[in-house]
Amino acid sequence: MGNNFSSVSSLQRGNPSRASRGHPQNLKDSIGGSFPVPSHRCHHKQKHCPPTLSGGGLPATPLLFHPHTKGSQILMDLSHKAVKRQASFCNAITFSNRPVLIYEQVRLKITKKQCCWSGALRLGFTSKDPSRIHPDSLPKYACPDLVSQSGFWAKALPEEFANEGNIIAFWVDKKGRVFYRINESAAMLFFSGVRTVDPLWALVDVYGLTRGVQLLDSELVLPDCLRPRSFTALRRPSLRCEADEARLSVSLCDLNVPGADGDDGAPPAGCPIPQNSLNSQHSRALPAQLDGDLRFHALRAGAHVRILDEQTVARLEHGRDERALVFTSRPVRVAETIFIKVTRSGGGRAGALSFGVTTCDPGTLRPADLPFSPEALVDRKEFWAVCRVPGPLHSGDILGLVVNADGELHLSHNGAAAGMQLCVDASQPLWMLFSLHGAITQVRILGSTIMTERGGPSLPCSPASTPTSPSALGIRLSDPLLSTCGSGPLGGSAGGTAPNSPVSLPESPVTPGLGQWSDECTICYEHAVDTVIYTCGHMCLCYSCGLRLKKALHACCPICRRPIKDIIKTYRSS
């Protein structure tokens, strides 16, 4: 019995003679990791206990991103300090290149934000050596896919903190609690339950609206200085009642809960949609790459309309039925698709959104110049074309609008084509405008992309592909508009008149051969007039332009504004 006891004792405590020389015995498992030991042994500072502050400082090796184990969408710079997600919203899991110390702050700077997605960074730790993880085995999401596996702990950063330029620091203490702070704010409890008896690598998922991050020099935080705020004192969107279970965040970090700023809509309380599913729906409605240079113009009509978030968000502060008109900061380009997301609607009710284009530079207008109703814009002398999105809209819906080289404004709704809505003059600079109605109280510009058509986008100044037509709301075709290209006596006949009346042109049907202007289509100025508009009888269009105009919603004659019921092609005798 004595021999057996001695054998067991030496196995648990290590050889006394070797211990006296500072060489405690290490036991390795099959992959080279230390065996876990009972928690009451950790105060003896055996080598398999995690590194702590008692070492006196940070390791000589700087904290970098692991060069090989990363998601398929991650692009990493040569210094291994900065990563960027190149497309989509997921497949962007990264790890640190070495284990972190207890109380070592992993410091990240957000370098790129893409507002078309929901959710933000997922931060945490893993006891699995990233060098032993094959990159192809990484799931799309840290939450819930990765944290559902043993040895991974992570949670979503509240979206309100995921702004470009913010510095996020997070760390784990000896009790397995994870804290974080934003910039120089107080420390806040993030989650708990991390197993600290094993080495821990940092885990960063560059998810959702966070597109790029940079690792800064890590720092040690002194336990005596930690006075974390209660998590309930923080205004954050991902608050949940947490138990002591290690991976409580498995099912909770993936819920789409509305942020305090309301930038992203959410379904009614009690019916949350997982952010992963929401983003998957959005990915079907959006291209892989979006340009982010398009903004809302500072001009807005409405006492309670605000332009927020670097002029990408237009918000109506009160739900009353009042004017809420906003414009793009620059003219849209031919074949440029503009993506707009409805990010807030009141009470889950459906709402409406008007949209259109104008040749009027918003910089030349004052809010007092704009009418209460967007439909009344047609009384102005500039070209205005306005209509409403067909069908109801809800929070989270994504609209795509594009003016093609033929002057047709097409609409898509959540990736599904809704057809041509307007026919406009693509030869002139066109600013896009939006008006919020009813329950729709906030929209966001997600970005834009150029869709090449038939070999590439056409030049916006080419008269050969410049249809000029009325809008779906019976817009008045003003005299300056008809003289856009300065060709023919038609433009000169009404030269500088202020077109507050529908037209100042002859209202009788025009027969071919009665003047030079009657030989050219008043839309394309290229083909000969060969079409009669029924029922008014005017002849001012070629057949191809007449067909396009007839397809427009509430199509009307460019001369007398009567509804177009049909078009009839005519043939001249030689």
Curated annotation (Swiss-Prot):
Effect of gene knockout: According to PubMed:11585928, knockout male mice lacking Neurl1 are sterile due to a defect in axoneme organization in the spermatozoa that leads to compromised tail movement and sperm motility; knockout female mice lacking Neurl1 are defective in the final stages of mammary gland maturation during pregnancy. According to PubMed:11481456 knockout mice lacking Neurl1 are viable and morphologically normal but display an olfactory discrimination and are more sensitive to the effect of ethanol on motor coordination.
GO cellular component: apical dendrite; cytoplasm; dendritic spine; glutamatergic synapse; perikaryon; perinuclear region of cytoplasm; plasma membrane; postsynaptic density
Record bears the keyword Cytoplasm: yes
Lipid-linked residues (N-myristoyl glycine): G2
Induction of synthesis: Up-regulated by synaptic activity.
Subcellular location per the Swiss-Prot or TrEMBL entry: Cytoplasm, Perinuclear region; Cell membrane; Perikaryon; Cell projection, Dendrite
Alphabetical UniProt keywords: Cell membrane, Cell projection, Cytoplasm, Lipoprotein, Membrane, Metal-binding, Myristate, Notch signaling pathway, Repeat, Synapse, Transferase, Translation regulation, Tumor suppressor, Ubl conjugation pathway, Zinc, Zinc-finger
Pathway: Protein modification; protein ubiquitination
Record region (Disordered): 1-53
One Gene Ontology biological process: protein monoubiquitination
InterPro entries noted in UniProt: B30.2/SPRY_sf, Neuralized, NHR_dom, Znf_RING, Znf_RING/FYVE/PHD
Bilayer-crossing regions: none
MF GO annotations: translation regulator activity; ubiquitin protein ligase activity; ubiquitin-protein transferase activity; zinc ion binding
Role of this protein: Plays a role in hippocampal-dependent synaptic plasticity, learning and memory. Involved in the formation of spines and functional synaptic contacts by modulating the translational activity of the cytoplasmic polyadenylation element-binding protein CPEB3. Promotes ubiquitination of CPEB3, and hence induces CPEB3-dependent mRNA translation activation of glutamate receptor GRIA1 and GRIA2. Can function as an E3 ubiquitin-protein ligase to activate monoubiquitination of JAG1 (in vitro), thereby regulating the Notch pathway.
Protein name: E3 ubiquitin-protein ligase NEURL1
